Every structure is written in structure tokens, then in C-alpha cells.
């Protein structure tokens, strides 16, 4: 992924109080069957900031099935405790302590209660991670389980308290000669997954689309992945170029990926079509707009491959870019969900629900002919919403007050954002 945000310093105030663990617990399974919509959350760029309230993306009409928390981007290199910044507030130190992570911890519980899976990602487009030995990889894998899994371990730092994630993602974009060791980290995680019979966990990866894949090819060839969020963008100029095959870009090599994994331990993995969520998303600048698929283009691509046995759905980078890209009253994430559910982008009536059993019924309000500014009531949950963040919409129950000088702008019955 394109890792753009500035790293948060270690001096952030307010250590997250770890909630003591008791017995192992279970989380609510995903409610809607079929192809899934996966969105990365927690890193920003291109002048775009996602809503810092993760729970805002777990509303019934958000269109999101899996949220990937990005990133733990520092590990190895002499330190065996992964650290990083997730969102605008939560910092995980090199000692494993969570700082200012209370709100994220509460949101994780809210999202999982709504049936949205939460996956924790390692890596990103930074050079602050590497592995030197098999033993180190296994040690880090065990630590990840103890600190973020349903381990029952009370002796380690747990940044999210008693909450645990639904899996671990590997967005390895730096090789450094250490790719051969990740298989041991993944194997250690899977061995621990087997100890928790009450829950199902995911191992996911976000490889670049070229084959051979320069950074994750060896990892995929020696590990069992459940989901592969292939980045079909930013690779027009690679030795073996690939992209979505639109806008004059390199060919779409989805079929090459199904052939590649057939002879690996990941032969049963689901392949997700990874896309930028706005014209700025792939590089953080207008230069990456060529890789962006408009909703109609994305619908055509998905329509061609959705019957493939390996097809898993859509992955997008990232939540903030999706929020800033509203068409027909729908964010890009909502457009993607409509494509997966209905085979077409959002109609003017608004986005489909990821959880139909609890979705609010749409009102008979007519869509406005032009953008209007709403007058939000006081937020029941408090807090402020950054530029482009969601501040209203049918069924939305998150914060409604925008950071000054922005106003909550209604763009459809289902979506209002701070602009």
C-alpha cells in the first residue's frame, strides 16, 4: 500500500489501560454471505484523512465487510515487538504499549459486534521492518498472537485490552532478503489459531500484481493464505507490467494469479481485486489517477470474474480516499458493495447494507438536485469529525460535529461528510 502519513512520535500522552483478560471469548460472525468488501483504515495521504472513529465504518450502510488496520510497520531490525501507528491517535510503542488507543479499542468491539471483521496489518511501504532468522520470525508470530489474539495471556502488553483481532495481514513491500522467514511467522500464528476453537481467523496478504511477485512471492509459495488482496495498480512500469487493464494501463492479470497459487500452499485462497478508492489513492497525487477505476469500470471488471471459484471480492486503499470520493450519494466503498451485491454501482436510492437484517429502511426523501449544507444536531457520542469524514446519513449514529471550519454537507440520503 502507499504509506504516506507522518509517523506519530513516542511522546503521545495517555497510555491505554489494558483490560484484564479472563476466559477466551468469541465474536459475532459476519452476517452477509458472498463476496466481501475489504477496506484499509489507519493511514492517510494526499491531503485526505479518514474518520478517526473506526466504528463509523461499521454502520449497516457502510458497505464494508472487513477492515484492515494499518500498520505495525516496525519489527525485526533488532526489535521483536512490532510497533506502529494505527489511525490518527493510536500508537503502539516498541515495548508493545498502546498509547491513546482507548477509542480504537472500543470501536473494534463495536465493529465486531456488527459482524465486521477486524484484521491487523504488518508492513506497508516503509523500510522499517525485516526478519533475520526463523527463530525471530516465530518469536514475533507468538508475540502477535499473545498481544492481539484471543490468547488469554495476561503477561504481555495488550493494546486493545481483552479485544482481539480476527486475523493478520501481511503487506510486505520491502524484501531485504528476509522473505523466506515470513512463512515461519505465519505458521506460528496458525498453530495458535488452532488453540481457539471458538473463533475463525484469517491470514491475508496484499501482494503487488506482477508475477513473479518481488516481495511476497516467496511468502505465498511457502505459506497458507486465506485472502490475497492483490494490488492491481502502480505497476505499469514494472518488468512484467500489470494493472486493471483500463485507461490505457497494463493488462489485468487476475488469471495469472489463479494459475500461480494453484501450485502453492495457498491454492485455496480467495483473490480480491485490489483498487485505489479515488483518483488520488494509488500515489497520493494526481499522477496516479490513471489507475483509478470509476464505479462503472469496476462493475464491468467484477462482472467478468465474479463467477471464478477464487474470486473473493474487492479490496480498496483506503477508507479516507473512499470518503472523499462520493458519487450518486455513495462513497467508493458503498459503490463497491453495491457492485458485489447488485452487479451495478449505487442507484440514486442509496447504498446496499452489509447487514440486511438490521439495516434501516430508506425514507421517501427526494434526492437533492444540488449539494446542500445540513444542520446537524449535537452528537450523542461526542467528538469531532475531520475533513471528508462521515457526519450524517440515513442510519448513521456516529459523531456529527465537523472540525472547524468545515461543515456537514448532505450529499444524499445515505451520506453527509465534512467539507
Curated annotation (Swiss-Prot):
Stimuli inducing this protein: Only transcribed when chitin is the carbon source. The promoter contains the consensus motif for the creA/crel/crr1 carbon catabolic repressor.
Domain CBM1: 383-419
PROSITE patterns: CBM1_2, GH18_1, GH18_2
Region Disordered, annotated ranges: 343-390
Disruption phenotype: Decreases the mortality of the host cotton stainer bug Dysdercus peruvianus after infection.
Main location per the UniProt record: secreted
Coiled-coil spans in chain: none
Signal peptide: 1-18
Active site residues of this protein: 173 (proton donor)
Sites carrying sugar chains: 153, 237, 256
Subcellular location: Secreted
Enzyme Commission number(s): 3.2.1.14
GO molecular function, one term: endochitinase activity
Positions with biased composition (Low complexity): 355-384
CC annotations in GO: extracellular region
GO biological process, one term: chitin catabolic process
Keywords, alphabetical: Carbohydrate metabolism, Chitin degradation, Chitin-binding, Glycoprotein, Glycosidase, Hydrolase, Polysaccharide degradation, Secreted, Signal, Virulence
Domain (GH18): residue spans on this chain: 35-343
Source organism superkingdom: Eukaryota
Catalytic activity: Random endo-hydrolysis of N-acetyl-beta-D-glucosaminide (1->4)-beta-linkages in chitin and chitodextrins
CDD domains (alphabetical): GH18_hevamine_XipI_class_III
One Pfam short name: Glyco_hydro_18
Similarity comment: family membership: Belongs to the glycosyl hydrolase 18 family. Chitinase class III subfamily.
Function: Secreted chitinase involved in the degradation of chitin, a component of the cell walls of fungi and exoskeletal elements of some animals (including worms and arthropods). Participates in the infection process and directly acts in the penetration process of the host cuticle.
Name used for this protein in its record: Endochitinase 2
Amino acid at each position: 500500500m502507499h504509506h504516506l502519513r507522518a509517523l506519530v512520535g513516542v511522546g503521545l500522552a495517555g497510555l491505554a489501560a489494558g483490560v484484564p483478560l479472563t476466559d477466551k471469548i468469541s465474536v459475532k460472525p459476519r452476517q452477509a454471505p458472498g463476496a466481501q468488501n475489504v477496506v484499509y483504515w489507519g493511514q492517510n495521504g494526499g491531503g485526505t484523512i479518514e474518520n478517526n472513529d473506526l466504528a463509523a465504518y461499521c454502520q449497516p450502510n457502510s458497505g464494508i465487510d472487513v477492515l484492515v488496520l494499518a500498520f505495525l510497520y516496525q519489527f525485526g531490525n533488532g526489535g521483536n515487538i512490532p510497533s506502529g501507528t494505527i489511525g490518527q491517535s493510536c500508537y503502539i510503542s516498541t515495548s508493545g504499549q498502546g498509547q491513546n488507543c482507548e477509542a480504537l479499542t472500543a470501536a473494534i468491539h463495536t465493529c465486531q459486534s456488527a459482524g465486521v471483521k477486524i484484521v491487523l496489518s504488518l508492513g506497508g511501504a516503509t523500510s522499517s521492518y525485516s526478519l533475520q532468522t526463523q527463530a525471530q520470525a516465530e518469536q514475533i508470530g507468538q508475540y502477535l498472537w499473545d498481544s492481539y489474539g484471543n490468547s488469554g495471556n495476561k503477561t504481555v502488553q495488550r493494546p486493545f485490552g481483552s479485544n482481539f483481532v480476527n486475523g493478520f495481514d501481511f503487506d510486505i513491500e520491502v524484501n531485504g532478503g528476509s522473505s523466506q522467514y515470513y512463512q515461519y511467522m505465519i505458521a506460528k500464528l496458525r498453530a495458535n489459531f488452532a488453540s481457539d476453537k471458538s473463533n475463525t481467523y484469517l491470514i491475508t496478504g496484499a501482494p503487488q500484481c506482477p508475477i513473479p511477485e518481488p516481495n511476497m512471492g516467496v511468502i505465498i509459495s511457502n505459506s497458507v493464505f486465506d485472502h490475497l488482496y492483490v494490488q492491481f495498480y502502480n505497476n505499469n512500469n514494472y518488468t512484467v507490467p500489470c494493472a486493471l487493464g483500463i485507461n490505457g494501463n497494463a493488462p489485468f492479470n487476475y488469471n495469472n494469479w489463479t494459475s500461480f497459487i494453484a501450485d502453492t500452499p495457498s491454492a485455496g485462497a480467495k483473490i480480491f481485486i485490489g483498487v485505489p478508492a479515488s483518483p488520488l489513492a494509488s500515489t497520493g497525487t494526481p499522477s496516479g489517477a490513471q489507475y483509478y477505476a470509476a464505479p462503472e469500470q469496476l462493475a464491468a471488471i467484477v462482472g467478468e470474474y465474479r463467477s471464478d471459484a477464487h474470486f473473493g471480492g474487492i479490496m480498496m486503499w483506503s477508507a479516507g480516499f473512499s470518503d472523499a470520493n462520493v458519487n450518486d450519494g455513495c462513497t467508493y466503498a458503498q459503490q463497491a458493495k453495491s457492485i458485489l451485491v447488485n452487479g451495478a454501482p449505487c442507484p440514486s436510492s442509496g447504498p446496499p447494507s452489509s447487514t440486511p437484517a438490521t439495516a434501516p429502511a430508506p425514507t421517501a426523501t427526494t434526492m437533492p438536485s444540488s449539494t446542500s449544507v445540513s444542520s446537524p444536531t449535537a452528537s450523542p457520542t461526542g467528538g469531532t469529525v475531520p475533513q471528508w469524514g462521515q457526519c450524517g446519513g440515513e442510519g448513521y449514529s456516529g459523531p456529527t460535529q465537523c472540525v472547524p471550519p468545515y461543515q456537514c454537507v448532505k450529499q444524499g440520503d445515505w451520506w453527509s461528510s465534512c467539507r
